[in-house]
Amino acid sequence: MDELPKCGANYVPLTPLTFLTRAFKSYANRTSIIYAGARFTWEQTYKRCCRLASSLQSLNIVKNDVVSVLAPNVPATYEMHFAVPMAGAVLNTINTRLDPMNIAIILKHSEAKLLFVDYEYLEKARKALELLMSTNFITAQNSKKISMPQVILIDDLYSPTRIQQQDQLEYEQLVHQGNPEYAPENIVDDEWDPIVLNYTSGTTSEPKGVVYSHRGAFLSTLNTIMGWEMGTEPVYLWSLPMFHINGWTLTWGIAARGGTNVCIRNTTAQEIYSNITLHKVTHMCCAPTVFNILLEAKPHERREITTPVQVMVGGAPPPTTLIGKIEELGFHVVHCYGITEAGGTTLVCEWQSEWNKLSREDQANLKARQGISVLALEDVDVKNSKTMQSVPHNGKTMGEICLRGSSIMKGYFKNDKANSQVFKNGWFLTGDVAVIHQDGYLEIKDRCKDIIISGGENISSIEVENAILKHPSVIEAAVVAMPHPRWGETPCAFVIKTKNPEIKEADIIVHCKKELPGFMVPKHVQFLEELPKTGTGKVKKLQLREMAKSFGIFDNANQTSQILDLPARL
């Protein structure tokens, strides 16, 4: 049997680009994209992507060149997920919330040859490019020479602004100028070839470039649509940024299911509610912060949801109270876990039929867990990262989430040191702390660096935050370590409250004493107008830890804490 050879008929490189070809052949007349008053079919989308790919090649884009895009969830961003790799290039979607300096750093590090910019972000892009070519920036980046990417405007498809300057290329112009006969055949020679370059939004350092292979992107897409049990012809609302892990790979996944992409520029309550009712949306993804947007919507912004909308939520673990409230509006929540380095969805809280008999509160508690491994991932475990031994399935012992599978990134671009830190003994170390329950479901407790060590006890900042969020006058909460002379560290809470002016620090502490063991109760509560966050909405806990130092109690005779089973690399 070993002598039977591979050939073109039985071995083909895996790539998510085949999902578009299949959608064109199988669902040609189905609606592929809706954006304001514009609509496309899968036949039109396929042909537009082919034309754009041919135009990119005419601009001397060759294999493995990086093409960056700074744009919201508009049709152009979606189409480039296919057209750019069709041309043999690597797509880099840039977080639109980043400041010009971070955009300049990404453009420099990625060596982008082209930069597609939506008209709303032209000024930000201009500032980034000015920084890119400035002497101070070049010196700070230890660069001898930085090449300027060619800028291509993305005007609004439905309501063009016509701000295109003379001699400046525009997206639709490239689409229409492309070769209508262009048919990408055998565009992927090796499934290990790169398809996208995504930059992490780290809260402690400059972003790192994460490289995915065609094979990894293909399997990650299957992970998401199978783990979510997404059927055919979904109507998917783009409330999740496409720049965030390629929309958790659903940029390719909606094509795989022959669905409809409902594109929106802004994630507002009115946009979400109106598009759900107008287009009969069946699926959407978001971070828990979007739940707050929907719950706080004004009466004129709301619409009645008559058919349940399946919502996959990731990011920070949502409080069980928040899940309960959002489901009362007509949303059905599925909790997942994923990180940029793993190519999207890694764990999903797969529903068990016996849970149907439980109370709504118990169901919400179960849904708040991150769940079990998706199908196409080889293995997931929670390990003591010093010994690499698995933790017991008792729901109490914390360890680091470790992953293994073909959907894991190729590695960090131009960063051997970081690669050596995260790949260990055949596993990828995520930096996330979790427990495993008796039923095998994982529950994230914290980031490794955010664990609070108080008198030798490991305290999950997320558990403390969830307890605080149960208070009716609290909108958001973040908990970090604060120095303490006896215990080493104790929890310090930063809270955003409602307009109730009566709530005091003592009220939060009394509330926490009812919800938590004494050693987990915050010793200080600081009220803020808003929490410091990164461009992707992650709380900047490093900044909060610096603030908490000023609230700490110091005693030079005793400032040590016993660290138990924390990852050695942190």
UniProtKB/Swiss-Prot annotation:
Optimum pH is 8 with cinnamic acid as a substrate. Its cofactor is K(+). Disruption phenotype: Disturbed benzenoid scent profile in flowers characterized by a decreased emission of benzylbenzoate, phenylethylbenzoate, and methylbenzoate. Mostly expressed in flower organs, with highest levels in corollas and petal limbs, and, to a lesser extent, in petal tubes, sepals, pistils, stamen, stigma, anthers and ovaries. Also present at low levels in leaves, stems and roots. A motif (Microbody targeting signal) lies at residues 568-570. Induction: Circadian-regulation with peak levels occurring late afternoon (e.g. 3 to 7 pm). Repressed by ethylene, especially in senescing flowers. Pfam families: AMP-binding, AMP-binding_C. The keyword Transmembrane helix does not apply. Pathway: Phenylpropanoid metabolism; trans-cinnamate biosynthesis; Phytoalexin biosynthesis; 3,4',5-trihydroxystilbene biosynthesis; 3,4',5-trihydroxystilbene from trans-4-coumarate: step 1/2. This is Trans-cinnamate:CoA ligase, peroxisomal.
